[in-house]
């Protein structure tokens, strides 16, 4: 299975599809419900949620532009008693789940009576901005002031909240209603002089919104993703040779969504077409459309995710193909034949939870049994490699701690594990089977570790756009290793005098840097201090960068229970790895356990970088 893959589900708020499940819930009940959705995503090894925060020209945050959403309290404009968007982002990030805020640009209401809107609603204050169609109210996409207002309303959330992405779905101009005409002739007469027909003008109105949102989002937050989930068919090949071998509704013509253009122009970071049909469906075959969209994104920087119809699987009234538990999982197997497909989004959360006919359980068993990293995007450099500071067997597994490398704080970390000795296979870190956990913290307990056996752990760091660092040095945990700690030269347990310099020159260093000093005929030792939990035997290992100009006989001092022992190490060779000084009997307590002395007759810098102490 892929190591990098977006795994997401839509959490819809309009008409209380997913969250909140009903209006009028208490703050604590609403929050508990949302946490349960995140917990479900985490249980399924998903790494993102797409949450509807502006369903009907309203807001799930205290917006200066639009009223509080009626789907929170039952009454539009009523304060729910907390900031839902701030709460949701915080809870998602605490689980290392990305939060993509989902906005519907033009829909105002699921009715056509403006008097039912709160009196301060912009659509009520500006009647010329709206039109009724098909029993609903919409903002008119052809009015420039409307477009600017919608963009401002969305950008308020972008600039004020730590969201990871902005998401638009398939609702642009309304879907056609038989016998009705969109009442925008006056706007076309006023603003459409440069276009030969109203249809090209309408498409341009949507194009302007998409292009301008792309520009504004990335000006405010260059790392934030902007994506659209359009209807799955752009155009049929029978209409346009660039179209797909399908015979369904054409979103280019029906709702004026030129989604292919957005990809080819690079106006979106990702496209997530809603390919809501089964494999073999005559009018719109899943395999045909997945291949077509793969061709569209090929050669661009736009990522392709697939919108999946979890709501169809096992549902009453659906085609027989959807009554087969393997329909959805077969979609993801088909995706693997297209390297352009980098993940999936499932509609919607309640259907993921329902797991009708076991379809979701089958899919997660086949494809989501291990965690996955979100696909990287952009060209930012990866963070520096972190360093593992401790790896200790505890009653419920192995407890790990680490620290960042370099000056830039990573957004998240990935933990890898190999059974037995350190990894030698160069493909180890590309293999999803070795990825154990992702987290935004700097500690993790591996509860899957057996009580016996040897494991080696590694940690990598990710930036905001998911570029991954080189791995940390491997940390070995053995059956008897009830205590193991690393003291790096940047840790609080390290001390050295002013004659010790700091360098990050060598790539063989442990962590961000190392210490160096000239040899002298006095000790002036650098010391590594830690708390030794109990008296007994310990293995002492040292890490240093090697260089032909470094010292050939650097004195390392071990403070054993019987007194100091000196072990001389040739630091010209065998650098960039753990090197054992031997096993020693240590006393319990907190003290300077290992030192690096400057007192040597040989020339070349003596190096103090990191020490590892493991109980035998």
Go through the PLM ranges and name each one.
Residues 12-32, 101, 106-160, 253-257:
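Active-site-adjacent "subsite" loops/lids of carbohydrate-active enzymes
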Residues 32-58:
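Catalytic domains of carbohydrate-active enzymes, especially glycoside hydrolases
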Residues 193-242, 246-317:
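Glycoside hydrolase catalytic-domain groove-lining segments
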Residues 256-260, 264-282, 296-380:
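Substrate-binding cleft of secreted/luminal carbohydrate-active enzymes
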Residues 363-409, 466-481:
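Pro/Thr/Ser/Gly-rich low-complexity, intrinsically disordered linker/stalk tracts
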Residues 412-452:
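Recognizes extended acidic, P/S/T-rich segments that occur
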Residues 446-468:
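Beta-strand-rich modules
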Residues 595-605:
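Short beta-strand-plus-loop segments that form exposed binding edges in beta-rich domains
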């Amino acid at each position: 299975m892929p190591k990098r893959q977006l795994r997401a589900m839509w959490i819809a708020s309009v008409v209380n599809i997913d969250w909140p499940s009903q209006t009028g819930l208490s703050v604590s009940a609403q929050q508990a419900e949302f946490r349960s959705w995140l917990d479900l995503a985490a249980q399924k090894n998903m790494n993102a949620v797409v949450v509807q925060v502006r369903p009907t020209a309203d807001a799930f945050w205290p917006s200066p532009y639009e009223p509080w959403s009626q789907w929170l309290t039952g009454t539009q404009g009523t304060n729910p008693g907390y900031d839902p968007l701030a709460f949701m982002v915080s809870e998602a990030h605490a689980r290392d789940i990305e939060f993509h805020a989902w906005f519907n640009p033009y829909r105002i209401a699921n009715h056509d009576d403006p008097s039912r809107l709160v009196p301060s609603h912009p659509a009520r204050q500006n009647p010329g901005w709206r039109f009724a169609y098909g029993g609903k109210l919409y903002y008119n996409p052809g009015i420039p002031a409307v477009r600017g207002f919608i963009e401002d309303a969305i950008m308020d959330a972008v600039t004020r909240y730590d969201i990871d992405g902005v998401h638009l779905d398939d609702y642009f101009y309304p879907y056609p209603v038989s016998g009705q005409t969109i009442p925008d002739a006056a706007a076309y007469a006023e603003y459409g002089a440069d276009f030969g027909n109203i249809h090209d003008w309408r498409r341009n109105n949507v194009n302007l919104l998409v292009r301008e949102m792309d520009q504004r989002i990335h000006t405010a937050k260059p790392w934030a993703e902007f994506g659209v989930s359009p209807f799955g068919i752009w155009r049929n090949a029978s209409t346009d040779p660039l179209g797909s071998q399908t015979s369904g509704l054409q979103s280019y013509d029906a709702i004026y969504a030129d989604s292919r253009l957005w990809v080819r122009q690079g106006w979106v970071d990702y496209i997530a077409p809603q390919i809501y049909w089964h494999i073999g469906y005559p009018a719109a075959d899943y395999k045909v459309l997945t291949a077509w969209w793969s061709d569209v994104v090929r050669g661009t920087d736009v990522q392709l995710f697939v919108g999946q119809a979890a709501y169809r699987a096992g549902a009453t009234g659906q085609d027989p193909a959807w009554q087969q538990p393997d329909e959805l999982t077969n979609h993801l197997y088909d995706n693997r034949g297209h390297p352009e497909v980098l993940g999936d989004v499932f509609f919607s959360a309640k259907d993921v939870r329902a797991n009708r006919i076991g379809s979701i359980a089958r899919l997660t068993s086949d494809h989501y049994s291990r965690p996955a990293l979100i696909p990287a995007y952009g060209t930012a450099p990866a963070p520096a490699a972190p360093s593992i500071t401790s790896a200790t067997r505890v009653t419920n597994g192995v407890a790990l701690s680490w620290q960042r490398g370099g000056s830039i704080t990573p957004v998240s970390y990935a933990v890898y594990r190999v059974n037995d000795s350190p990894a030698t296979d160069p493909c180890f870190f590309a293999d999803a089977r070795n990825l154990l956990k992702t987290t935004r913290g700097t500690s993790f307990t591996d509860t899957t570790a057996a009580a016996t056996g040897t494991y080696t752990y590694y940690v990598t760091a990710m930036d905001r756009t998911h570029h991954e660092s080189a791995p940390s040095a491997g940390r070995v945990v053995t059956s008897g290793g009830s205590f193991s700690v690393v003291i790096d030269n940047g840790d609080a347990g390290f001390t050295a005098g002013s004659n010790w310099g700091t360098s990050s020159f060598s790539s063989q260093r442990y962590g961000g840097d190392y210490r160096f000093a000239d040899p002298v005929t006095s000790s002036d030792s650098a010391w590594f201090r830690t708390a030794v939990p109990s008296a007994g035997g310990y293995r002492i290992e040292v890490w240093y960068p090697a260089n032909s100009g470094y010292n050939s006989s650097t004195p390392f001092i071990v403070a054993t229970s019987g007194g100091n022992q000196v072990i001389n190490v040739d630091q010209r060779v065998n650098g960039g790895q753990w090197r054992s000084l031997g096993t020693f009997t240590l006393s319990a307590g907190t003290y300077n356990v290992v030192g690096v002395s400057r007192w040597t007759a040989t020339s070349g810098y003596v190096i103090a970088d990191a020490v590892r102490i493991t109980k035998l």
